[in-house]
């Protein structure tokens, strides 16, 4: 069984990430990204997709031209877990 983070654990973990925040109205974290153009945004999404597939943990995302919004939540746990934090940390590492 996957352990859903408590609100205290989630707050501590989010604080260690860059730009992530609690999603409104659900137990998830999200972040928005802006790139130079669509090619850069799509390249970023491709790198995230490869890592997500390796982790077997897939983001919810929305893309319009140079903007990407990512929401992370673990469906099996109905909330944020370490898997979300690990994927968010990876995403931070490729956007630093």
From Swiss-Prot:
- Entries under CDD domains matching the protein: PCD_DCoH_subfamily_b
Instruction: Spell out the reaction equation it catalyses.
Output: (4aS,6R)-4a-hydroxy-L-erythro-5,6,7,8-tetrahydrobiopterin = (6R)-L-erythro-6,7-dihydrobiopterin + H2O
Query: Which EC main class describes this enzyme?
Result: lyase
A GO molecular function term, named singly, is: 4-alpha-hydroxytetrahydrobiopterin dehydratase activity
One biological process term from GO is:
tetrahydrobiopterin biosynthetic process
Tagged with keyword Iron-sulfur = no
Lyase found in the keyword field: yes
Under Enzyme Commission nomenclature, its number is 4.2.1.96
Which PANTHER family does this one have?
PTERIN-4-ALPHA-CARBINOLAMINE DEHYDRATASE
Spell out the family assignment given in the record's similarity comment. Answer: Belongs to the pterin-4-alpha-carbinolamine dehydratase family.
Q: Which NCBIfam families match?
A: PRK00823.1-2 (NF002017), PRK00823.1-3 (NF002018), PRK00823.1-5 (NF002020)
Q: What is this protein called?
A: Putative pterin-4-alpha-carbinolamine dehydratase
* Annotated source species: Paraburkholderia xenovorans (strain LB400)
């Amino acid at each position: 069984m996957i352990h859903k983070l408590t609100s205290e654990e989630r707050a501590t973990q989010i604080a260690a990430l860059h730009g992530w925040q609690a999603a409104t109205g659900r137990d998830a974290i999200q972040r928005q990204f802006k790139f130079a153009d669509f090619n850069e945004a799509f390249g970023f999404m491709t790198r995230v997709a490869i890592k997500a597939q390796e982790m077997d943990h897939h983001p919810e995302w929305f893309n319009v031209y140079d903007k990407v919004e990512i929401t992370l939540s673990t469906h099996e746990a109905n909330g944020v877990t370490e898997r979300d934090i690990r994927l968010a940390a990876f995403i931070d590492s490729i956007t630093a």
